[in-house]
A protein has these predicted regions:
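Eukaryotic intrinsically disordered, low-complexity regulatory linkers and tails enriched in Ser/Thr/Pro
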Residues: 2-161
């Protein structure tokens, strides 16, 4: 009987500790986790609705270019997501560029692509026989990669400016 009481006491103590630790962890959240979100940018989607995007999450803006994308749209890549919008490339670049510094580069097909410099984590040379023949470099970010015509040196210089 004493062994059973002892086991129950230990179990009760463990439960109390677990509840205390969970409560303490909830109270000591990182300030960014409890801070209110900044201003959202609103874009008109292809279906006529609107989509709000946190500008801090945007990393790439370009016009659609592949056969599996809606023609004539603008692509905003953000936080591992993608939204296609009706607005012009110039309008989107102006709206985002007013909040986040954008750098303009050239896609292998010749179209412009705008990258948020702060999102760039690295630049590598294009891989022969794997990258597009017109690509000279690959811009790397946490969210993805973008092949461009500029050299790695030119990209590195542009990103630090």
């Amino acid at each position: 009987m004493d062994a059973m009481k002892s086991s129950l006491s230990v179990l009760a103590l463990l439960c109390l500790c677990l509840v205390s630790w969970t409560t303490a962890a909830g109270e000591e959240r990182h300030p960014a986790a409890i801070a209110p979100q900044g201003a959202q940018l609103t874009f008109q989607t292809l279906d006529g609705n609107t989509q709000q995007v946190n500008p801090d999450e945007i990393w790439r803006i370009r016009a659609t270019s592949t056969s599996d994308e809606p023609p004539g749209a603008i692509v905003i890549d953000y936080a591992f997501e993608r939204v296609y919008v009706k607005e012009s490339l110039a309008s989107v670049v102006e709206k985002v560029g007013g909040i986040r510094p954008l750098k303009k580069f050239t896609l292998p097909g010749g179209a412009p692509v705008y990258i948020v410099a702060a999102k760039v984590t690295g630049v590598t040379r294009a891989i022969p026989h794997q990258s597009h023949p017109n690509a000279h470099a690959i811009i790397v970010s946490r969210e993805g990669q973008t092949q461009v015509q500029e050299t790695p040196e030119a990209i590195s210089e542009a990103v630090v400016k």
